[in-house]
């Protein structure tokens, strides 16, 4: 029997695996290829349209310790999860999946401290979610029995296992804090009735995804002021007011009574593209349906002129040229802020986004 895996990072990775929304595999494949090249990896991308995941296979094995710290799930815009993978187990027997998975884990020569079973976000794969819940405890016990798992041990990586179908398992690893906050990169957020619209969940996800804890604590506190452009019926406005900010909601349309009942909101009937505040505010948020370059120009102008310290905004993307549209907006913002100083610009295709991405922009001095 092979020796018990050690309490160190002795794992060797075979490539990278990214989860995404079905239909966005092409964008993730392009991003993953560029990312791999940027960190010195050579290999090739594999994907299948509609599969909701993409893999990169390296020509040569890579030390996990060298790769793991670079694999922050926020790095790729269109990926919900980004993980180094070290083994693929095929032809899993229906009556005993634990043994071959545990054997492959032990053979990798690494002990793990946390276990997470995931599936791609497709109708076919999600049928296995019940199996994953039932299988987690028995698999963990088997891993513990062979010495490949020590729950909660400090300094050890997490073990993520992806089941794209009933007979295949991709074995992946992540350092604590490097993988997505939620299994499959899908947040479990509760929709409150008074929030006016489900769009409030998009802003809630953006706040947790695009901002650090330090940034959240500094910028989302009672007494600060925010502006919501194109606010009606008030999903984003409610999210800010619920956190204690006083919000100016700019929209010619009506606001939901539940939002106005917070007594934290002033409704201004005006055009979101032309209205400007009399004094600078902490936040401007914008979820208007408009050409992405027009939104990018708007948010860049608010930051460049000091009307707000930071902004979260949504860019509606064309279906056939998503990456090109993102880079066009990035270039536009960069040019507008050339004289304003260093800035933070982050994009992410959130779970609550569809044909769109959400961005965060702030001058570097305001980023913390």
Swiss-Prot record:
GO CC annotation terms, alphabetical: cytoplasm
Matches recorded under Pfam families: FtsJ (PF01728), RlmM_FDX (PF18125), RLMM_N (PF21239)
EC number of this enzyme: 2.1.1.186
Subcellular localization(s) per the UniProt record: Cytoplasm
Disulfide bonds: none
Keywords, alphabetical: Cytoplasm, Methyltransferase, rRNA processing, S-adenosyl-L-methionine, Transferase
Chief subcellular location: cytoplasm
Keyword Transferase: yes
Record flagged with keyword Methyltransferase: yes
InterPro entries: RlmM_FDX, RlmM_THUMP-like, RNA_MeTrfase_FtsJ_dom, rRNA_MeTrfase_M, SAM-dependent_MTases_sf
A molecular function GO annotation: S-adenosylmethionine-dependent methyltransferase activity
Binding site for S-adenosyl-L-methionine: 199, 232-235, 251, 271, 287
Active site residues according to the UniProt entry: 316 (proton acceptor)
Reaction catalyzed: cytidine(2498) in 23S rRNA + S-adenosyl-L-methionine = 2'-O-methylcytidine(2498) in 23S rRNA + S-adenosyl-L-homocysteine + H(+)
Biological process according to GO: methylation; rRNA processing
Family to which the UniProt record says this protein belongs: Belongs to the class I-like SAM-binding methyltransferase superfamily. RNA methyltransferase RlmE family. RlmM subfamily.
PANTHER family referenced in this protein's UniProt entry, alphabetically: RIBOSOMAL RNA LARGE SUBUNIT METHYLTRANSFERASE M, RIBOSOMAL RNA METHYLTRANSFERASE FTSJ DOMAIN-CONTAINING PROTEIN
Quaternary structure and interacting proteins, as annotated: Monomer.
Protein function: Catalyzes the 2'-O-methylation at nucleotide C2498 in 23S rRNA.
Protein name according to UniProt: Ribosomal RNA large subunit methyltransferase M
């Amino acid at each position: 029997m092979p020796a018990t895996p050690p309490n160190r990072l002795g794992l060797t990775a075979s490539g990278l695996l990214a989860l995404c929304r079905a239909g966005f595999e092409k964008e993730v494949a392009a991003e993953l290829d560029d990312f791999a090249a940027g960190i010195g990896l050579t290999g090739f991308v594999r994907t299948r349209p509609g599969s909701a995941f993409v893999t990169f296979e390296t020509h040569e094995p890579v030390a996990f310790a060298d790769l793991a710290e670079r694999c922050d799930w926020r790095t790729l815009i269109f990926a919900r999860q980004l993980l180094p993978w070290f083994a693929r187990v095929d032809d899993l027997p229906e009556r005993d999946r634990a043994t071959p998975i545990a054997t492959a884990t032990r053979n990798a020569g690494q002990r793990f401290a946390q276990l997470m079973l995931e599936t791609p976000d497709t109708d076919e794969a999600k049928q296995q979610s019940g199996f994953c819940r039932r299988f987690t405890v028995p698999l963990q016990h088997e891993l513990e029995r062979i010495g490949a798992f020590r729950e909660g041990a400090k300094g050890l990586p997490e073990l993520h296992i992806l089941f794209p179908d009933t007979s295949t398992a991709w074995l992946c690893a992540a350092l604590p804090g490097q993988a997505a906050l939620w299994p499959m990169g899908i947040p479990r957020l509760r929709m409150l009735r008074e929030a006016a619209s489900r769009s409030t969940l998009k802003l809630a996800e953006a706040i947790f995804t695009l901002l650090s804890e330090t940034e959240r604590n500094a910028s989302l506190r009672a007494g600060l002021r925010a502006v919501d452009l194109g606010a009606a019926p008030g999903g984003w406005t409610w999210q800010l007011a619920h956190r204690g900010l006083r919000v100016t909601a700019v929209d010619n349309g009506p606001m939901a009574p539940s939002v106005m009942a917070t007594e934290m909101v002033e409704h201004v009937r005006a055009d979101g593209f032309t209205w400007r505040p009399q004094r600078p505010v902490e936040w401007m948020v914008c979820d208007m349906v408009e050409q992405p370059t027009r939104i990018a120009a708007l948010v860049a102008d608010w930051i460049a002129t000091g009307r707000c310290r930071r902004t979260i905004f949504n860019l509606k993307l064309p279906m056939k040229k998503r990456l090109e549209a993102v880079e066009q907006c990035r270039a536009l913002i960069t040019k507008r802020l050339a004289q304003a100083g260093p800035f933070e610009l982050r994009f992410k295709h959130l779970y609550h986004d569809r044909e769109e991405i959400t961005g965060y922009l702030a001058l570097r001095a305001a980023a913390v």
